[in-house]
């Protein structure tokens, strides 16, 4: 039994998914949009980046499904004087808010150590005073409570790790072969009616022949790049899955928490910052940019003065001041947030709003310049001559011709917003300290890097996860820009 919990950021993420679903349906009904997205998928790097982003998004969505677990009857006192108390106690729920990802990663969360331990280690990273059975005290590296605890002989460590990695690689190879063949079977019917599934003599191409065509790179969509990326992901994930039950793959932090768990939990924060901030930024940029470019005159002067003044203020200083003011309000009114999760979620949502309000100026300038050009086109002048209202002209004729700029800017700003959260959390004005994020991991690693011996794996883990998240977002953004920018296409072909 559990009680579903929808936090503010959860509701906005679900709303964003609904918008994406609506956009997908619109793309299916629009031939020009289908052609543009087909140009995106023809890019091998974009297809591989989309697969990596999908894995990150899946982890983030699993961490967005929150609930409160039910308390067991033994943990709730039942009084005999209250009729139906047993049934009432069965309906009580814990104050702890968990997610589906927490349930899946419960073995990692329950296997905490006392303090630091290196990746795949069997002993602690620092010496401790240990009392021997004869009463003597010595300084040595103690055995971990969970990491490598199954090993009877420490000499078997290398063999055990290699066997687990080998089993994971074999399982990855088998699973990759099955998924690849299923993908080929699923894709071949979509090619029916075209020329790519026909032999030179006109006969129908078999599944094996279509698979050979895919691996030769002769298919319209570069499925070979997708399958190779899928193979690398499986070869990385499954061996780690084999090691996780017995080892801390990425080590532990100061309080003994598994660093792999912290890194996976930090993905939701990065994705929420990158997506929800865009939802806040777009209305300001769209409305003010179109108004400035369409109406011109004093409206243009006023909007230019507004975003020029806002852009002249140092961004980090403005965000830090707003976050600190909000933090004072949160701490002085604890009754607003019954649980720690609600307080941390509200601070994350507030950070998204603050970043969105302070980062719309660049897109607004682009939309203003494009609107200044669009308002002089003949179809806009004709609409004005026939008496069509200004707002209807902007909605029907200006806005659709700005969407390629909006889409390109949104995708390209995602990586910058992810890095902005890390910087703000590093300086102490980011998300709540109780919330996992790459910024808090980097902030904690600041002192760990200066100790002796140096603890390097927390910073390295945050760097690797952020690197692949931002790299895949940038590669996908480049493909979207190349596909949707009309200046790069002349007569339906790339210039």
Residue ranges and their predicted role:
Residues 184, 195, 226-236, 252-495:
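Alpha-helical transmembrane segments of integral membrane proteins
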Residues 1-281, 430, 434, 439-463, ...:
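Gly/Trp-centered helix-boundary motif
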């Amino acid at each position: 039994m559990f009680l579903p919990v929808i936090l503010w950021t959860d509701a906005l993420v679900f709303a964003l998914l609904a918008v994406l679903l609506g956009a997908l349906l619109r793309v299916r009904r629009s031939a020009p949009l289908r052609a543009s997205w087909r140009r995106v998928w023809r890019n091998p790097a974009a297809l591989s980046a989309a697969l990596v982003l999908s894995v990150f998004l899946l982890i983030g969505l699993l961490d967005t499904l929150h609930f409160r677990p039910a308390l067991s009857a033994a943990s709730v006192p039942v009084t005999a004087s209250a009729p139906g108390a047993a049934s009432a106690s069965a309906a009580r729920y814990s104050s702890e808010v968990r997610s589906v990802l927490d349930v899946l990663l419960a073995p990692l969360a329950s296997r905490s150590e006392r303090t630091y331990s290196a990746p795949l280690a069997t002993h602690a990273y620092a010496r401790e005073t240990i009392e021997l059975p004869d009463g003597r005290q010595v300084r040595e590296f103690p055995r971990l409570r969970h990491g490598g605890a199954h090993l009877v002989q420490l000499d078997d460590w290398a063999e055990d790790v290699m066997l687990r990695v080998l089993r994971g690689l074999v399982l990855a190879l088998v699973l990759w072969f099955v998924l690849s063949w299923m993908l080929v079977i699923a894709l071949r019917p979509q090619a029916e009616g075209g020329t790519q599934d026909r032999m030179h003599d006109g006969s129908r191409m078999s599944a094996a022949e279509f698979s050979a065509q895919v691996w030769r790179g002769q298919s319209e969509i570069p499925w070979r790049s997708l399958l190779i990326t899928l193979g690398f992901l499986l070869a990385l994930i499954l061996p780690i899955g084999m090691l996780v039950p017995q080892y801390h793959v990425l080590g532990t932090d100061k309080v003994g928490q598994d660093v792999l768990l912290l890194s996976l939990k930090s993905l939701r924060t990065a994705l929420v910052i990158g997506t929800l901030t865009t939802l806040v930024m777009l209305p300001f940029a769209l409305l003010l940019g179109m108004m400035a470019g369409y109406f011109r005159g004093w409206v243009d002067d006023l909007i230019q003065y507004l975003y020029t003044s806002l852009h002249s203020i140092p961004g980090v200083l403005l965000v830090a001041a707003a976050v600190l003011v909000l933090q004072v309000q949160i701490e002085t009114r604890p009754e607003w947030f019954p649980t720690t999760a609600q307080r941390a979620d509200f601070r994350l949502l507030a950070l998204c709003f603050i970043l969105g309000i302070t980062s719309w100026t660049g897109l607004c300038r682009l939309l203003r310049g494009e609107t200044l050009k669009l308002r002089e086109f003949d179809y806009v002048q004709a609409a004005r001559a026939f008496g069509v209202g200004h707002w209807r002209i902007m909605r029907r004729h200006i806005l659709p011709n700005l969407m390629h700029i909006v889409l390109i800017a949104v995708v390209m700003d995602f990586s910058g917003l992810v890095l902005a959260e890390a910087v703000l959390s590093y300086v102490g004005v980011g998300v709540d300290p109780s919330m996992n994020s790459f910024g808090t991991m980097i902030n904690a690693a600041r002192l760990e890097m200066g100790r002796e011996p140096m603890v390097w794996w927390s910073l390295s883990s945050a760097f690797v996860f952020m690197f692949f998240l931002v790299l895949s977002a940038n590669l996908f953004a480049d493909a979207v820009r190349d596909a949707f920018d009309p200046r790069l296409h002349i007569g339906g072909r790339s210039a």
